[in-house]
């Protein structure tokens, strides 16, 4: 959902709350839980869960390794769920012609940089830059070029958009800001 008018525009950015992140966090959690249960079952010499058999696994060394991978996977899955819960990377790009300001806001990790907000005068915008790298996975980025600053990305790195959609977004933004498009 984006907000557009003649003098004001807001583009919302989806962060970590994507379907793929939910999928991978669940898969990692279930897989690592299975590893951990099999490792503990090999130590206890009985099956904790009926569908995970550990009768052929010796505790030393396989059971220890299974427990280790299970614990490591659980930590990784908790990290993924924490990232999803905080919605890291979400935010918005706000372009206000009346105030003459561009504001870019993103949510970060807890601490000093939890809220990341950059503001620039619209008059300092030089161009909208497109970057396309057709490697696996394909990387299609839209940047805003600001005088005396690094190029600032306006979309997610993992955003899966077609070349046509990217060009349309960039052209629409360039028309709104009355700047040129670079790249491609």
From Swiss-Prot:
Keyword presence, Glycoprotein: no
Keyword Magnesium in record: no
GO-annotated cellular components: chloroplast thylakoid membrane; photosystem I
Recorded superkingdom: Eukaryota
Record field: transmembrane: 21-43, 63-85
Localization per record: Plastid, Chloroplast thylakoid membrane
Membrane topology designation: Multi-pass membrane protein
Main location: plastid
Pfam families linked: Ycf4
Annotated S-S bridges: none
Keyword line: Chloroplast, Membrane, Photosynthesis, Plastid, Thylakoid, Transmembrane, Transmembrane helix
GO biological process: photosynthesis
Protein task: Seems to be required for the assembly of the photosystem I complex.
UniProt family annotation: Belongs to the Ycf4 family.
NCBIfam families from the UniProt entry: PRK02542.1 (NF002712)
Annotated protein name in UniProt: Photosystem I assembly protein Ycf4
Organism: Chaetosphaeridium globosum
């Amino acid at each position: 959902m984006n907000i557009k008018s003649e003098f004001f525009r807001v583009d919302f950015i989806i962060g970590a709350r994507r379907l793929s992140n939910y999928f991978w966090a669940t898969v990692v959690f279930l897989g690592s839980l299975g590893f951990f249960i099999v490792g503990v079952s090999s130590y206890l010499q009985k099956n904790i869960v009926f569908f995970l058999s550990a009768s052929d696994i010796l505790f030393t060394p396989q059971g220890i390794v299974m427990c280790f991978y299970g614990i490591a996977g659980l930590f990784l899955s908790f990290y993924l769920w924490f990232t999803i819960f905080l919605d890291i990377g979400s935010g918005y790009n706000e372009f206000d012609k009346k105030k003459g300001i561009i504001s870019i806001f993103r949510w970060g990790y807890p601490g000093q940089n939890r809220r990341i907000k950059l503001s620039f005068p619209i008059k300092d915008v030089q161009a909208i830059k497109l970057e396309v790298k057709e490697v696996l996975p394909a990387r299609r980025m839209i940047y805003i070029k600001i005088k005396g600053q690094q190029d600032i990305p306006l979309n997610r790195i993992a955003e899966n958009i077609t070349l046509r959609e990217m060009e349309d977004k960039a052209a629409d933004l360039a028309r709104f800001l009355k700047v040129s498009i670079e790249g491609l």
